[in-house]
């Protein structure tokens, strides 16, 4: 029902982004771990072009972010295609936000509990700081939700999400600077894991 209601918005934004992204497409697909760590492809609206420099390297994000892309991010419209993930059963409306698979390799046992439920479009951490929330606190919020999820909690999260979107509270143009919110020291470990994976794939 929700997907049917938002379908006019999806169609308009898809056409809008198709032209704004200069042929780079309107959708962005990325692998994310879901319930029990099962990998699925999350769908979002693509807010950047694929423009590259003379050497073939992608230009900085700030240069590739379009005006329309900035708008869909600041209004959280870029998240709407994830209702398709909900329809497919990969995600839920409410739950911990899905991160990239590399986090599975750095989580401790307690942090990994966030995967005991399906990831959500919005969640307890999103209505308590979103991109400005420190990682340690974000994961504590996620585990709290796992232990306390209920219809009443979900309704509360939905209501708080609507308020946050309307007042654009804790909503930015993109994810916060990871080094600003990473109080767990995950960033260097993740970068090292990704470097080794690139080297392995290059062989």
Regions found by a protein language model. Name each.
Residues 14, 28, 66-70, 102, ...:
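Positions in alpha-helical segments
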Residues 7, 40, 63, 78, ...:
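Generic recognition of short, well-ordered alpha-helical interface segments
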Residues 127, 132, 147-149, 159-160:
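Soluble extracytoplasmic domains of inner/organellar membrane proteins
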Residues 13, 27-28, 57, 94-96, ...:
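Short, hydrophobic secondary-structure boundary micro-motifs
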Residues 61-118, 161, 165:
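A short, structured surface patch at a secondary-structure boundary
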Residues 25-64, 122-140:
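Short, glycine-rich, amphipathic interfacial segments at transmembrane boundaries or analogous
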Residues 1-50, 157-203:
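A hydrophobic, helix-centered structural microdomain
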Residues 136-152, 174:
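Compositionally biased, charge-rich terminal segments
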């Amino acid at each position: 029902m929700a997907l049917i209601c938002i379908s006019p918005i999806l169609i308009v934004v898809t056409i809008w982004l198709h032209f704004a992204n200069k042929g780079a497409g309107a959708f962005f697909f990325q692998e994310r771990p879901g319930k029990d760590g099962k990998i699925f492809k999350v769908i979002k609206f693509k807010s950047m072009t694929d423009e590259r420099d003379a050497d073939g390297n992608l230009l900085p994000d700030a240069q590739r972010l379009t005006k329309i892309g900035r708008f869909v991010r600041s209004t959280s419209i870029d998240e709407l295609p994830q209702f398709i993930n909900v329809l497919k059963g990969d995600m839920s409306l409410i739950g911990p936000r899905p991160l990239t698979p590399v986090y599975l390799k750095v989580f401790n046992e307690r942090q990994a509990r966030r995967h005991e439920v399906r990831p959500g479009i919005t969640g307890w951490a999103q209505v308590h700081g979103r991109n400005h929330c420190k990682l340690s606190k974000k994961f504590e919020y996620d585990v709290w939700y796992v232990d306390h999820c209920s219809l009443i909690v979900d309704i509360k999260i939905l209501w708080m999400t609507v308020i946050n979107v309307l007042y654009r509270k804790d909503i930015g143009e993109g994810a916060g600077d990871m080094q600003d919110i990473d109080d767990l020291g995950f960033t260097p470990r993740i970068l090292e894991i990704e470097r080794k994976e690139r080297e392995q794939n290059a062989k």
